[in-house]
Amino acid sequence: MLLMLVAGCAAPPLPPKAVFPSNLPNGIVARSIRSDGLNGDFFQRPSRKPQRALIMLGGSEGGKMWSNATNQIVEFVNEGYCVMSLAYFGADGLPNDLRGIPLEYFAKAFHWLSTQENVIPNDYALLGVSRGAELALLLGSRYPEVRTVVAIAPSSVVFPGPPKGLLDALRGQHSAWSFGGKEVTFVPIPFSWTTLRGMITGKRTRMFEKALQKKKAVEAAAIRVENIQGPILFVSFSRDQVWPSTWMSSQMMQRLRDRGFRFHYEHSDYDTTHSNWSFEPCWAKILDFLRGQAS
């Protein structure tokens, strides 16, 4: 039962392994990134014009799930972006589990991009879904190189990572992220019948709502989105069965208003579920938001 405590942080099921695209249109070059401990794929249409990089982050399925999203990659490249699909666990050379992932790993990705020909340095857009959205916002709050964030079904706080097994769960919960060798403060998932029911039924939103009632823990683990150095788009789903992405997005919007955030920010909510991020109205909104920011 305790194993279930934090398993509810999972994103919707997606392909566990990336298949390197072989059906890209002519003119788009794909290459693997395996240097300085990184594991990712990079997509670019060669051009003499400097291009802005978009880093795409998956959720708790691990690996490079965006490398499978050929249609989305092509759309972003056609808008003038170069695209990095970046794994941060669950891939060769990386941790097996979503636990204590060093944020410094992503600084290596920023550095790698800064060394690439015709890539605009230190001006990156991040797009993440579920735990990847939590990560994108967290990185934006700590690294000024992040100048745009698209957060799909995001969390407003840091949550723990799933345990490795029952014995591991009995030892306690651990943050999904670390910085400077220390765990990033997180909101624990309480052990209760609400948690148990959520894990049995698959409807886990109430479980997270209970965790979010702990005001002191929430404030300590809140992502400082007001520190992000550029525009933010929150995309949420009113029938989200994983966690309350609509409520958490609204909380972050209020936080930005209260702190006089000087960049553009908006929240688009859709009457659908956590796993339906690619449906047409949602994806059209994301493209429209990023359009015109590619250079």
Predicted regions and their residues:
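Short substrate-entry loop that stabilizes the transition state in hydrolases
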Residues: 49-51, 57-95, 241-245
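Alpha/beta-hydrolase active-site loop
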Residues: 97-117
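Alpha/beta-hydrolase fold nucleophile elbow
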Residues: 118-130
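Glycine-rich nucleophile elbow surrounding the catalytic serine of serine-hydrolase chemistry
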Residues: 128-138
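Accessory cap/linker subdomain of secreted extracellular hydrolases
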Residues: 141, 148-227, 242, 258
